[in-house]
Amino acid sequence: MIKKIGVLTSGGDAPGMNAAVRGVVRTALSEGLEVYGVYDGYLGLYEGRIEKLDRSSVSDVINKGGTFLGSARFPEFKEVEVREQAIENLKKHGIDALVVIGGDGSYMGAKKLTEMGYPCIGLPGTIDNDIAGTDYTIGYLTALNTVIDAIDRLRDTSSSHQRISIVEIMGRHCGDLTLMSAIAGGCEYIITPETGLDKDKLIKNIQDGIAKGKKHAIIALTELMMDANELAREIEAATGRETRATVLGHIQRGGRPAAFDRVLASRMGNYAVHLLMEGHGGRCVGIVKEQLVHHDIIDAIENMKRPVRSDLYQVAEELF
């Protein structure tokens, strides 16, 4: 029977992580369990930075961005000896199970701990929305609002200067954030891992728009597709129209979480505790068609694929 639960946040921070931690802590305490916070993710787990949490520990955090527990990249966690030390640190506090909030790298750590016999539940905390088995990840919709706000501001100045603007948006190998931002922000062109980049077609479309009297354009580009500044130089050389790239960077991860992310994170944190109490381990939580679900964490990492939103790409194609 579970008596003590640990919780950590790992990888890139996402708005709503604090709400998720709060959901875990308050639910566990309501069920008569003890809760321990692990500071700075798997690094802190390895170094033994673990402290008992109470209700006041998570007071006034639901509205704050980032994660008060801290987070850190710690690739050394893939080493067996490192994980053995981490488990030993959990056992020192009598912690029976762990809730891990983060992206696919964090899930991999939870998977490894599960394989070593330590029950873990994963919660999807990443602005990239690239986790299989869930329609939305914690932080995604807040980041979407942040990106749209930036696009709106860029459109103002691009229009004033008759300029083409490229907006580089986070997402790694998933174009969801770029796609939704482009639709909501009224972008003229979109480049994501799912669409690829036909540079000749892009330049021709821009030239056609200029010929029809279009004064400015916004291009939404997913990070890692190509160098945004190099693309800007090529477009300017081909069209004669001033072109500038704006890399939004880590501003997309910050800020007060939107109401949706606060509620989603709270629900997921609550659900994770109940899963552990029911004897589940090695699972990850998602939301599908507004219903909370859980999957085998190994399947989420290795077998499940996020569906390409072909319907929304069709909408984007017709609107752009």
Curated annotation (Swiss-Prot):
Substrate binds at residues 126-128, 163, 170-172, 223, 244, 250-253. GO terms for biological process: canonical glycolysis; fructose 1,6-bisphosphate metabolic process; fructose 6-phosphate metabolic process. Its cofactor is Mg(2+). Pathway: Carbohydrate degradation; glycolysis; D-glyceraldehyde 3-phosphate and glycerone phosphate from D-glucose: step 3/4. The active site is at 128 (proton acceptor). Its EC number is 2.7.1.11. It is found in: Cytoplasm. GO terms for molecular function: 6-phosphofructokinase activity; AMP binding; ATP binding; fructose-6-phosphate binding; identical protein binding; metal ion binding; monosaccharide binding. Keywords: Allosteric enzyme, ATP-binding, Cytoplasm, Glycolysis, Kinase, Magnesium, Metal-binding, Nucleotide-binding, Transferase. Mg(2+) binds at residue 104. Belongs to the phosphofructokinase type A (PFKA) family. ATP-dependent PFK group I subfamily. Prokaryotic clade 'B1' sub-subfamily. Homotetramer. This is ATP-dependent 6-phosphofructokinase.
